[in-house]
Amino acid sequence: MRRAVSLFLNGMQPSRLAAVLAVWCLCLLYVLFQGGKTSLMLFSMVSLLTIYLIGAGFGGVNRVKAQRRVLGGAEHGGEQLHAGEQVRVKLEVHVPGLLPMPYMIVREVLQRHNGDSWSFEDSVIPNLRGAGKLVFQTPPLERGRYAFSKTECISEDIFGLMEHKGRIEVQTDFRVLPRTIYIPKWQRNIRNSRLGGTHTTISASRRETTQINGVRDYVYGDRISRIHWNATAKTGSWKSKEFEHESFPRTMIVLDCSADGYAHAQQFELAVSAAASLIEYGAKEHAGTGLFTATREAQMFAPADHAGERMRMIQHLVDVDYDRKTKLIASLEKSYRHFPKGALFLLISPMSGKDASEIMRWVETRGMNPCFLQITNSNETKKRDDSISLLQSRGISSYSVSSLDELPAALGGGA
């Protein structure tokens, strides 16, 4: 009973409720002191109207049931949402009770993990069974975790005298992954390291070894020496030998998350998207790829080649933020024991080549192969070229991009 009264008082404006009760009391006094058929008829009409107005406050929007569905990547055969995509939200509501409801205003609030929010408001006209449907589309969303707060429902009676409010909570949250771009090839100069023992290679794709790894379907153009005759005889269709590929040294992607290094949030989003795209490239090439995010609380993922670990890295990039106040070299010193020797150390950072050269020297002393990807603003082209040439003069593979579309060409062109 206490809960019902609380819902009733929360969903109805006190001023309008007081006005309705005042009119009913005046009619009651009119019947008591005046009497007669006219006063009795007026009191009966006002009483029925009061019962309807107050009764609507105990039901209707205070007992609305809803179900929400988020439609985005699932429409294209997957469940993953990427930054820049719009999300289609479908909200189905059911209003219990027999009292008619002319319309209902629904207010939705979508909140991002960093505090940003978007508000959506529209009207729903319930049918005779009290069911209604609201469909709306969000603007293009950036990476992050999103959740809907409590839904607010507002309705009025058929006379427009009383306004009723109610709140319902439907737990709905989803994650938006960083933007990625397809990288067809990555030319990298892996120099011979005395500590790491790797060899000099500049390759856009891994060469095949003589070790047979399995059997695959015949592809037009395969040499006769590649045909697997035993498998062809057993299956009745042409089969070819599948050879193992040369393995690239493990790659460690280091994302610089300095709070002072990035001019604005979009520049950091570009760095995150570049890291995610390179992780996807490593999965495509079956190369062991790891991730180190130099945030306020640095986190490291060891190089791995299976899909589960790759998805963990991508999911981690959803929540990462540029909040580190200390120098990058200090963050690396705390975790350098976990960096594999001989690995390719790719630094993604907005720092200039002069500042990055100190990091590159540190990488070389730890027996790793340095590589630098500079994230710049589009209006800093001249500064970017001077910065990159400084590292290129030392034989370090260096790239510079100011937008995600430039990444495939920059990596494919080499240093």
Describe these PLM feature segments.
Residues M1-F8, A18, Q187, Y220, ...:
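Exposed, interaction-prone extracellular/peripheral surfaces
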Residues C25-C27, C153, C257, C371:
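Generic recognition of cysteine residues
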Residues L48-F301, L344-I348, W362:
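An amphipathic, basic-hydrophobic helix/alpha-beta surface used to engage anionic
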Residues M1-Q67, E79:
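Extracellular/lumenal glycan-associated context and N-glycosylation machinery
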